[in-house]
């Protein structure tokens, strides 16, 4: 066990789980109800990372450019609600854990690290997704988009973990795939690993200057 770090926090989408196919399906199902075009999966990928409301706002902005159709504030809220409905029904139809995630998490847990999830994903979806892959029991805390007043890239979730478990920021390592993860960790004073395989708006994670850059989740064991 690395004696510097006591707690390891993880992003969810694009870090632990490849959820893009189910997210894209749910976005397009919601758009279709309002006679809006279907977005390519590779485009939906660039919209992920700031929570459901921002995801839908980006989708509607794209749809507006395609069709010229502008939705009312009420309709925008309805699209978001329909997205949440469809995603709730399709959390893990085709989503998959990334390679070596479960085994690596189990090893870290056995080594004595406190594990936590910090995601901007709607809070009500977090535990069900983790449970679907049989890894929810490995985490001592699971924070979603509605768990706290602020979400990443704000450092509040990491400060919360420090306070709850009694650790200093230097004792926390965060692992994510997006610039939001790197910014939040740096702002909180935590070390951070950037993963290259996730959803960072098609921007290389190296540009956000994480402390380590890994291509494979199992590489965490080289520093822990």
Curated annotation (Swiss-Prot):
Record carries keyword Ion transport: no
Cofactor annotation: Mg(2+)
Which sites bind Mg(2+)?
11, 13, 177
The protein's enzyme class: hydrolase
* Pathway connected to this protein: Organic acid metabolism; glycolate biosynthesis; glycolate from 2-phosphoglycolate: step 1/1
Q: What parts of the sequence cross the membrane?
A: none
- Function, please? Specifically catalyzes the dephosphorylation of 2-phosphoglycolate. Is involved in the dissimilation of the intracellular 2-phosphoglycolate formed during the DNA repair of 3'-phosphoglycolate ends, a major class of DNA lesions induced by oxidative stress.
> Which protein is depicted?
Phosphoglycolate phosphatase
Species, as recorded: Haemophilus influenzae (strain 86-028NP)
